[in-house]
């Protein structure tokens, strides 16, 4: 264990990597960024969630003199990171608004005495007199900026407090190296990070956005509640997050899950701080393995054993979706990212977009219009993800500008079975209804009203608009409304219809005339079946993992975590337990060959896990 005030002198990068982090080699991009930081250069790392960004400043901190300062946006996030570092034998501390005056004084004192190799701080704290005075006394060779996309107004999570970082750096006696890290940054956001942080010719590494261990799927269930219960029933022994668009939906979903017997909890901004903290800790420590939450439960999650993320509603942007879905599988284990889509999600998202910009009093009318247009463009891209029949992984990578194979072979769309059907008659009915509704009203209506009209629904709105008087009223009464909406979306994908991005009205394109008046055939690629649950994943090669042994190791991990009052993943990650179950180490030396087992953790937990493996092996041998 590294003692207070010590540094890893005499150790090379690989020795530190092995001893403190338990990994035999660096991942893509890590060594380049670490070398740049150790040489005093600025750096920008764009790596997917779970790609090892934090190691790029944690490891150099052990080899550099003095103390590395880490700017982190959320209290819960920095607390989890500090807990994990201390558990690995690395002295780390944090300063945030949740600490008492005595705790702050103790942390300031320890920092002055060289007790920490890493100190985490919220950006709001940087320019306070007390912290500035402390920082000016310390040797700070490196400032790491986590979640650096928060500094860009083009990013999906802009935080004005991040703009204070540059002024803080200017107040230091000597400018340290600055390293910025993010998981979701387009080229425009990356340029903003470099410009605003004033990075000097930074070593820039973009390892890509692909997360091969994540399996993406978009489902269109008739009943989201039934589909959600089915999905969670198939994952009862796993931990996961269910993201919802509104606080009301969080309450409804959490209640639904609890009534069905799931140990679920909730998180949204409407809860008081104490309840949010209590619920988050219950989730982190696996007392409540299912969390229903709004996006307020975002960057504060550093839980590595999340096996699935389900979006009950569609998010407002691809950036937000990829960041939230990326909470799954952070330890590299296979994980599911499933989105339950309905056309009503688009309406909800637009309401949230217009409402949030209208409530922002800091914006001028011109700025408000610009923000709304930008958000609507993002929403259109997100809607495209939900409607595409192409590879879902490819769609996401396209959005972030990363080359990829045409198909991944492992997302819901790649695994689905399709057939070509002649939908000319259905297309003519829908296109005719669009034209007749527009001619009657003088404007275009949305997919919901169109589908109700074609189905023959007696809703008050249809009658109020007089659409029940159209010749196309009830033409598709034999089909459920959800099926009609699917055909409408299919015609939009095929270029026969287009949706107004602001008002949501649907109109015909020039291509529609050929179908209506020239009998152009409409051949569509449609799924053979519409599934309420996830599509069956292709069977991988036989796993080397012994599932009963893995279950025994997880049970031991849980008992140790409960005894020590720490989250289970702090003891060992799921990926480490998978490797342990596959390798079945019989000695301490063999245990150190397991990925994620460093010397400190081997010394702390090794005997218990080796005993569990020996007991299992002995029992299994007797039974066989």
Protein language model features and the residues they cover:
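Flexible coil/turn residues that form the inter-helical turn or adjacent wing/linker of helix-turn-helix
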Residues: 174, 236, 389, 443, ...
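Short helix-to-turn junction characteristic of helix-turn-helix DNA-binding domains
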Residues: 37, 232, 283, 386, ...
């Amino acid at each position: 264990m590294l003692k207070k005030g010590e540094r890893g002198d005499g150790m090379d990068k690989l020795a530190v990597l092995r001893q403190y982090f338990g990994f035999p080699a660096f991942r893509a991009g890590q060594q380049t960024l670490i070398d740049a930081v150790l040489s005093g250069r600025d750096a920008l790392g764009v790596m997917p969630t779970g790609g090892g960004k934090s190691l790029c400043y944690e490891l150099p901190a052990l080899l550099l003199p003095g103390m590395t300062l880490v700017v982190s946006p959320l209290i819960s996030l920095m607390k989890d990171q500090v807990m994990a570092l201390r558990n690995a034998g690395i002295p780390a501390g944090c300063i945030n608004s949740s600490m008492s005056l005595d705790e702050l004084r103790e942390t300031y004192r320890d920092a002055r005495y060289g007790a920490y190799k890493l100190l985490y701080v919220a950006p709001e704290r940087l320019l306070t007199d007390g912290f500035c005075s402390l920082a000016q006394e310390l040797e700070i060779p490196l400032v790491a900026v986590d979640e650096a996309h928060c500094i860009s107004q083009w990013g999906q999570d802009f935080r004005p407090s991040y703009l204070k970082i540059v002024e803080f750096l200017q107040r230091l006696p000597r400018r340290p190296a600055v390293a910025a890290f993010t998981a979701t940054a387009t080229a425009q956001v990356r340029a903003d990070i470099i410009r605003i942080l004033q990075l000097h010719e930074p070593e820039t590494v973009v390892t890509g956005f692909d997360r091969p261990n994540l399996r993406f799927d978009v489902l269109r269930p008739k009943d989201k509640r039934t589909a959600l219960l089915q999905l969670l029933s198939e994952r009862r022994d796993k931990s996961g997050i269910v993201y919802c668009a509104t606080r009301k939906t969080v309450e409804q979903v959490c209640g639904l899950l609890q009534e069905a017997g799931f140990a679920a909890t909730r998180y949204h901004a409407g809860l008081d701080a104490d309840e949010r903290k209590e619920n988050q800790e219950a989730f982190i420590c696996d007392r409540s393995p299912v969390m229903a939450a709004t996006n307020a439960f975002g960057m504060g999650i550093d839980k590595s054993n999340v096996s699935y993320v389900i979006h009950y509603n569609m998010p407002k942007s691809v950036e937000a979706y990829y960041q939230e879905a990326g909470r799954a599988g952070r330890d590299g284990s296979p994980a599911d990212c499933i989105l339950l889509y309905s056309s009503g999600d688009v309406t909800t998202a637009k309401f949230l977009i217009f409402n949030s910009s209208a409530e922002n009093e800091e914006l001028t009318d011109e700025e408000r219009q610009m923000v709304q247009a930008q958000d609507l463009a993002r929403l259109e891209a997100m809607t495209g993800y939900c409607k595409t029949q192409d590879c879902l992984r490819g769609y996401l990578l396209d959005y972030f500008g990363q080359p990829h194979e045409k198909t991944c072979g492992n997302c819901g769309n790649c695994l689905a079975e399709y057939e070509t059907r002649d939908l000319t008659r259905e297309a003519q009915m829908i296109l005719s209804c669009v034209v007749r509704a527009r001619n009657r009203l003088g404007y275009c209506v949305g997919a919901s009203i169109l589908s109700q009209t074609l189905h023959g629904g007696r809703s008050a709105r249809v009658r109020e608009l007089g659409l029940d008087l159209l010749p196309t009223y009830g033409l598709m009464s034999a089909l459920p409304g959800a099926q009609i909406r699917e055909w409408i979306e299919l015609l939009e994908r095929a270029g026969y219809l287009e949706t107004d991005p602001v008002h949501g009205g649907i109109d015909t394109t020039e291509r529609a005339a050929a179908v209506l008046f020239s009998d152009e055939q409409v051949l569509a690629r449609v799924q053979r079946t519409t599934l309420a649950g996830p599509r069956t994943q292709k069977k991988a090669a036989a796993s080397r993992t012994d599932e009963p042994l893995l279950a025994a190791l997880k049970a031991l991990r849980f008992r140790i975590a409960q005894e020590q009052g720490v989250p289970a993943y702090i003891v060992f990650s799921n990926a480490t337990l998978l490797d342990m179950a596959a390798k079945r180490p019989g000695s301490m030396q063999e245990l150190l060959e397991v990925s994620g087992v460093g010397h400190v953790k081997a010394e702390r937990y090794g005997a218990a896990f080796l005993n569990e493996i020996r007991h299992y092996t002995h029992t299994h041998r007797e039974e066989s």
